[in-house]
Amino acid sequence: MNRANFGLIKLVTYIPNVGEQSKRLGALLENSIIDLCSADKSIPNDMRSFLSLNSTDKWSKVINVINNINNRRIPIENCKIKAPIEPGKIICIGLNYKEHANEAKMAIPKEPIVFSKFDNAICGPNDSIIKPVESDEVDYEVELVVVIGKQAKNVSESDALQYVAGYTVGNDVSARDWQLRKNNSQWLLGKTFDTFAPIGPSIVINPEVAALSDDTYFDPNNLSIKCTLNGQVVQNSTTKEFIFNIQTVVSYLSKLFTLNPGDIIFTGTPSGVGFIRKPNPIFLKSGDVIKCEIEELGSLVNNVK
């Protein structure tokens, strides 16, 4: 496989010009985007379709496109960045940081706590999080999101990262009144209102599966993770504090059901969520701006409407 000379691969879904509606698959550089399908017609123009390719040379094709200086770069200011993927399954892990479990006064789980969201919850960078009229207790949760790149069933922890295409930033927005009190405290109902799963801005490709150079390697289980609300830091931790690391989560889930390319996994949030704060809990209101940041993966910014 050809080696990249540019560092990490960051793939985005974008609309190239204001007024257009068709989404495109691109490679994100510092201040520009390369349209992958325009440069190589064999590359699908959709993230999930691309990840579903069985071809072993799909990463080489992307690397070749990015390395070719003759390929047109589109200034990022001329593009609208969308959610990087329209996922298959949206799987979520609850209480996966010890400090978060402690602040919630819940027992440290012995196995991953699993719930889900529906695809109506997905939105992208700079999209508005819509505060539903049915909830007065909407909360934030910065999370690292795993993107599956290869069908996984009964995989071992030692092999699990080979099934991970990459990672992105997510916000597991939660209506605490529905999650914890209303209608028998159903987590699903509290987690899957429209726009309650912002993700982005890009999928940072797992260097192991793309055979990138050693200097691009990063450990997804040891990244700083932070959330700011209106400029004030409300969550600040590291994925080193995972109770169940990414290998454990992927392996565990694959033994329960098949993971397919394009499935995504929210891996849990650190301490600092709004509803637990004493004496004054914090809930999102119209006009708030939330910034979720993860080392190596970038920043995801959304406003509340």
Swiss-Prot record:
Keyword Chaperone tagged: no
MF term (GO), any: metal ion binding
Listed cofactors: Ca(2+); Mg(2+)
EC nos: 3.-.-.-
InterPro entries noted in UniProt: FAH, Fumarylacetoacetase-like_C, Fumarylacetoacetase_C_sf
Keyword list, A-Z: Calcium, Hydrolase, Magnesium, Metal-binding
GO biological process, one term: small molecule metabolic process
Keyword Hydrolase included in the entry's annotation: yes
Annotated binding of a divalent metal cation, by residue: E141, E143, D172
Biological function: May have hydrolase activity.
Family: Belongs to the FAH family.
Protein name per its UniProtKB record: Fumarylacetoacetate hydrolase domain-containing protein 2 homolog
Gene: fahd2
